[in-house]
Amino acid sequence: MANSGLQLLGFSMALLGWVGLVACTAIPQWQMSSYAGDNIITAQAMYKGLWMDCVTQSTGMMSCKMYDSVLSLPAALQATRALMVVSLVLGFLATFVATMGMKCTNCGGDDKVKKARIAMTGGIIFILAGLAALIACSWYGHQIVSDFYNPLVPMNVKYEFGPAIFIGWAGSALVLLGGALLSCSCPGSESKAGYRAPRSYPKPNSAKEYV
């Protein structure tokens, strides 16, 4: 039968990773202005996220502007946004399903085998959520690297990795690991066999027979 400690560890890791994915999706620091070469900006720092771009002054004040048009955004940014939204929705669904299937909860009935299968289903959904987020962050990171080493892109508009993309990678890893631990909670074949009555063997005939 599934180990409740393993289930709790996997669920905690997956939930923590999902919270990290929510945070990285919301904050605008997916890429930040580069300081390579002669592109040294001391008065302000520029950030770009999935939904807005921001400028932070040397005084600490930040001003942000939402993207005006969805159709004018690059294809990589639109795909990243879509994958992150899918990841968050799957993570929310996986949290609900896994909670019902964990041994330490009273949801999902008293059938331990059924609850273990529900927890395994939640783990699989967590894995799908982690994969979607990992693909999104890696795709976005690849685009940053391509633009950084593109000689046609001026130095004053080059960007580097921001904190959000590292949070996304870490969150994806936690969600994947947590989902894998939850998926290992599937009951073994011994739990499916159920109770078997002991076999009864015929008693040996006695040496003497009485009439």
Curated annotation (Swiss-Prot):
Q: How does it sit in the membrane?
A: Multi-pass membrane protein
Q: How is it modified after translation?
A: Phosphorylated.
Signal peptide stretch? none
Q: Which residues lie on this side of the membrane: Cytoplasmic?
A: 1-7, 103-117, 182-211
**Localisation per UniProt entry:** Cell membrane; Basolateral cell membrane; Cell junction, Tight junction
Record region (Disordered): 190-211
Please give the residue ranges for the topological domain Extracellular. 29-81, 139-160
Any one Gene Ontology BP term: bicellular tight junction assembly
- Kindly state the subunit structure of this protein: Directly interacts with TJP1/ZO-1, TJP2/ZO-2 and TJP3/ZO-3. The phosphorylated form interacts with EPCAM.
- Task performed by this protein: Plays a major role in tight junction-specific obliteration of the intercellular space.
Name the family.
Answer: Belongs to the claudin family.
The molecule here is called Claudin-7
Name the gene behind this protein.
Answer: CLDN7
